[in-house]
């Protein structure tokens, strides 16, 4: 059997009196009505709940039943037979009265068993008869699920019970039904009429009661918060969704801040009120909820650099700052004011996140402006350098100004190191012209520089040799002369200049045609004296070279044989093989000093006779190994180096004891090209 939900001063069932085994009637309550019995549970549960036949049950006397008690009347005494049983109504007779005390004699006991009791324990004999099948009426009503908790309190059925005229109404928890018990048939008919109305009124009363409870709690909270700290702020209506967050996530996060007691939201006014124990807690909760919008003006010419390729730069700013989004205003958008030549970047997020985004963007703008200033300064310097270097550039040169020019072309250390800023330069430097040797492993100067790699191509040398005659030659053009000049001081050892020999293929042919002529006139390796007013390292003017080349040579002038004997490397024979019979000559400075003391100015005559091809081969070897500072490269040396093979010689000491750069040697096969 299910239990009953009781509450208030209303009995949880229909009150009855149940006859015990000793004839006394004990108080009980009817919980259910069956065909021939009723389910009774006793007061204080002194006995277990059980079904009792109608013959052992009667209704209690009416509440208005009152009868004066006199001597000799039969009465019922509220008493108990032993300590284990509760009190019940036992039948007795009044033997004597004295004031408020009555001497009673129990009918079931001997006449000698008397007891003195007060008037409160006496009542007239109950006139109700024992119950029958028609003594009790029951009506059940199904309770909606949302009202079951409310119906468990019997106080809510007080008016319904009065309207029905029922004896009791209670909720049976077992089957969630409302039991209506009565001793008359009228409540049964009315229950079907008033049932739906009763449930509707219950629902309305529950809603009002819940609102009253919330209002009461709010009143108590307001009284507590009146003396606490609070923060009040307003958020734009279109940003309320961001402020509240997904499913109220931001409000929940703000409420979890230690020290925050309550957060109120005025939806109509978009106003937040935060109450807390400390002002720091209120401010921290406000930082989670206060969303706003602010803009930063960006110069129009820097918009592309601020956004970056595919928006990478601006996306990094958004990720680092934590803003919700950023919007770049278009020209047609008139929502926000625009300054002249400026484009607004509008950030949306909390005030702290917007402040971080503004700091990042302003720093990036200042960086871009500084870079632009440096770029403009560099452009001005470049323009000034172009104007200064215009007088030294050949007028007809088509090599981009990088194939040589003035002696200052070698002083390009700073500009060479700044190639990260300017990958293309229009002044100074090397490897910039057409048809020149190009290197990617080093600057325009350095240890890896080699004069042979910077020389003209074979086609250019053929054109020059074809244009040149066996005797005089026109001075080289200004661009060619500048390419043959020695580079100025810079990084690495200085490059080795080309020798000044004046032999070529056409002059050799003339010697072969005229055997009686002096062959040594073609092999002059002497150096012209530089002019007094020329600077060190500058080649002599073209007119001086022309006059020097036409001067008749005497026996005092050095010949190719001198250079051949002083060669540092192995000589090449006419068959192109190394001459291993001759040892290497290393101390050339001592031999020159000894040669200066001779009267004829020549070497000893005990040498083997050599051919003209040997002279030419040795002269070419000498010209390739001539140390720096001896002579400047001449136009004839450029056209005369047409060897069919090139061999590398090991590094040897120069006249001043320093190591020279690696040299490339060429040789003629069979003495002719």
UniProtKB/Swiss-Prot annotation:
InterPro entries xrefs: Agenet-like_dom, FMR1, FMR1-like_C_core, FMRP_KH0, FXR1_C1, KH_dom, KH_dom_type_1, KH_dom_type_1_sf
Modified residues (Phosphothreonine): 413, 599
Repeat keyword on record: yes
Annotated positions of the Phosphoserine modification: 192, 452, 455, 465, 534, 567, 581, 602, 604
Known tissue expression: Highly expressed in brain and testis. In brain, expressed in the subventricular zone of the lateral ventricles and in most of the granule neurons of the dentate gyrus of the hippocampus.
Compositionally biased region (Gly residues): 397-407
Positions with biased composition (Basic residues): 584-596
Positions where Phosphotyrosine occurs in the chain: 78
Amino acid composition bias (Basic and acidic residues), ranges on this chain: 458-483
Record region (Disordered): 388-673
UniProt similarity note: Belongs to the FMR1 family.
PANTHER family named among the record's database cross-references: FRAGILE X MENTAL RETARDATION SYNDROME-RELATED PROTEIN, RNA-BINDING PROTEIN FXR2
Domain comment (free text): The tandem Agenet-like domains preferentially recognize trimethylated histone peptides. Disordered region at the C-terminus undergoes liquid-liquid phase separation (LLPS) for the formation of a membraneless compartment that stores mRNAs.
Functional summary from the UniProt entry: mRNA-binding protein that acts as a regulator of mRNAs translation and/or stability, and which is required for adult hippocampal neurogenesis. Specifically binds to AU-rich elements (AREs) in the 3'-UTR of target mRNAs. Promotes formation of some phase-separated membraneless compartment by undergoing liquid-liquid phase separation upon binding to AREs-containing mRNAs: mRNAs storage into membraneless compartments regulates their translation and/or stability.
The protein's name: RNA-binding protein FXR2
Record gene name: Fxr2
């Amino acid at each position: 059997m299910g239990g009953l939900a009781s509450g208030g001063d209303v009995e949880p069932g229909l009150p009855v009196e149940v006859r015990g085994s000793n004839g006394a009637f004990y108080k009980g309550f009817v919980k259910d009505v069956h065909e021939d019995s009723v389910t009774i549970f006793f007061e204080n549960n002194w006995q277990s709940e059980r079904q009792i036949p109608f013959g052992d049950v009667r209704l209690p006397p009416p509440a208005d039943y009152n009868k004066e008690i006199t001597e000799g009347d039969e009465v019922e005494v509220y008493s108990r037979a032993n300590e284990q049983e509760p009190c019940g109504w036992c039948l007795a007779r009044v033997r004597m009265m004295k004031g408020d005390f009555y001497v009673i004699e129990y009918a079931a006991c001997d006449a000698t068993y008397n007891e003195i009791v007060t008037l409160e324990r006496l009542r007239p004999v109950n006139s109700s008869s024992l119950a029958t099948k028609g003594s009790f009426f029951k009506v059940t009503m199904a309770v909606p699920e949302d009202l079951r908790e409310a119906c468990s309190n019997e106080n809510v059925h007080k008016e319904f019970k009065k309207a029905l005229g029922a004896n009791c109404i209670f909720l049976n928890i077992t089957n969630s039904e409302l039991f209506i018990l009565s001793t008359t048939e009228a409540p049964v008919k009315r229950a079907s009429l008033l049932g739906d109305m009763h449930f509707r009124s219950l629902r309305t009363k529950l809603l009002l009661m819940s609102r009253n409870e919330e209002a009461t709690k709010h009143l108590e909270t307001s009284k507590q918060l009146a003396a606490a700290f609070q923060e009040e702020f307003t958020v734009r209506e279109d940003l309320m969704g961001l402020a509240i967050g997904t499913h109220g996530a931001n409000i929940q996060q703000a409420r979890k801040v230690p020290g925050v007691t309550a957060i109120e939201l005025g939806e109509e006014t978009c106003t937040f009120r935060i109450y807390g124990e400390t002002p720091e807690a209120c401010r921290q909760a406000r930082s989670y909820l206060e969303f706003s919008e602010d803009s930063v003006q960006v110069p129009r010419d820097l918009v592309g650099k601020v956004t970056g390729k595919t928006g990478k730069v601006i996306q990094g700013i958004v990720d680092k700052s934590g803003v919700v989004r950023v919007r770049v205003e278009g020209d047609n958008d008139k929502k926000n004011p625009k300054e002249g030549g400026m484009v607004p970047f509008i950030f949306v997020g909390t005030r702290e996140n917007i402040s971080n985004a503004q700091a990042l963007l302003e720093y990036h703008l200042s960086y871009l402006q500084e870079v632009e200033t440096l770029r403009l300064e560099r452009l001005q310097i470049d323009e000034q350098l172009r104007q200064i270097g215009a007088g030294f550039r050949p007028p007809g040169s088509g090599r981009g100004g990088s194939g040589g020019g003035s002696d200052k072309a070698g002083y390009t250390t700073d500009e060479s190191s700044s190639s990260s800023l300017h990958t293309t330069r229009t002044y100074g430097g090397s490897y910039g012209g057409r048809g020149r040797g190009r290197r990617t492993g080093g600057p325009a100067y350095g240890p890896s520089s080699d004069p042979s790699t910077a020389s003209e191509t074979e086609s250019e040398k053929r054109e020059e040799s074809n244009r040149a005659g066996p005797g005089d030659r026109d001075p080289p053009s200004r661009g060619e002369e500048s390419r043959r000049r020695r580079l100025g001081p810079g990084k690495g050892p200085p490059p080795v200049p080309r020798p000044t020999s004046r032999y070529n293929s056409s002059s050799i042919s003339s010697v072969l045609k005229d055997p009686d002529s002096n062959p040594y006139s073609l092999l002059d390796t002497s150096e012209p004296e530089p002019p007094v007013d020329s600077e060190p390292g500058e080649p002599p003017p073209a007119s001086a070279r022309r006059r020097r080349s036409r001067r008749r040579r005497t026996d005092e002038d050095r010949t190719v044989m001198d250079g051949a004997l002083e060669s540092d490397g192995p000589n090449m024979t006419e068959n192109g093989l190394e001459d291993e019979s001759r040892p290497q000559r290393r101390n050339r400075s001592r031999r020159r000093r000894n040669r200066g003391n001779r009267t004829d100015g020549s070497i000893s005559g005990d040498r083997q006779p050599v051919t003209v091809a040997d002279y030419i081969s040795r002269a070419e070897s000498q010209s390739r190994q001539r140390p720096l500072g001896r002579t400047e490269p001449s136009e004839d040396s450029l056209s005369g180096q047409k060897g069919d093979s090139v061999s590398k010689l090991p590094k040897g000491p120069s006249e001043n004891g320093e190591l020279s750069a690696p040299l490339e040697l060429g040789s003629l096969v069979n003495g002719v090209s």
